[in-house]
Amino acid sequence: MRDPEFWHNKWAANQIGFHLEDVNPLLIRFWSDLAPKRSEKVLVPLCGKSEDLIWLANQHDSVQGVELSQIAVRSFFAEHFYTPTVTRLNAQHELYQFDELTLFTGDFFTAPVESVDLVYDRAALVALPEEMRTEYAQRVLQLLKPGGRILLVSMDYVQTELSGPPFSVPEAEIRTLFMGCEVRRVYQDTSIDPHLNKRTQAGLSRFAEEVWVIEKSE
């Protein structure tokens, strides 16, 4: 992944304002829109130490996550008093396994992830600059089985008003990135995101948090 030091430094300095302490209510509300089955395998790209992993593991037999930072993954298991089995796969990746959870550390684009039926993306696409997002979408679709579904949470604002991350990913770009898939917006909230500080909010002329259901063709 390009500029990995940016994220390594964020975790090392505990500058993780993007981390939610609780399960994302949008996940709880909209996951059922994917018509998920317990046996279907789930992928969470750029998962951090998200509480969403726990929620998903209670719904599914296999949840894979990929996270660049070892600090994040080790913190996740330590904070939940889990003792994972750790395997060094190669110079770039480690594998952490505990019950339904399988987490890889290292670059998402090269991690040896198994193909999956479902993808949950709350903080991956919006964490990437525009020049990386096409490659990211291609990688996700490569890992997604035919007929697989994605629940995507995105943000839409005037990019020149905020440097990001999180970055703005407007509707037109999402439809282009996932061209050939069925793309449906199932939610749009135009109130300012409570995770943005007041100074940032004051500089935005508009803001929308959006949820998308994306289905890969059979």
UniProtKB/Swiss-Prot annotation:
Gene Ontology annotations for the cellular component aspect, listed alphabetically: cytoplasm
One record GO biological process: response to metal ion
UniProt subcellular location: Cytoplasm
GO molecular function, one term: thiopurine S-methyltransferase activity
A Pfam family reported for this protein in Swiss-Prot or TrEMBL: TPMT
Enzyme Commission identifier(s): 2.1.1.67
Primary subcellular site in the record, as a coarse category: cytoplasm
Annotated InterPro entries: SAM-dependent_MTases_sf, Thiopur_S-MeTfrase_Se/Te_detox, Thiopurine_S-MeTrfase, TPMT
Residues given in the record as S-adenosyl-L-methionine binding sites: W11, L46, E67, R122
Catalyzed chemical reaction(s): S-adenosyl-L-methionine + a thiopurine = S-adenosyl-L-homocysteine + a thiopurine S-methylether
Lineage: superkingdom: Bacteria
Keywords: Cytoplasm, Methyltransferase, S-adenosyl-L-methionine, Transferase
Annotated PANTHER family: THIOPURINE S-METHYLTRANSFERASE
HAMAP family: Thiopur_methtran (MF_00812)
Family: Belongs to the class I-like SAM-binding methyltransferase superfamily. TPMT family.
Protein name: Thiopurine S-methyltransferase
Species of origin: Vibrio cholerae serotype O1 (strain ATCC 39541 / Classical Ogawa 395 / O395)
Gene: tpm
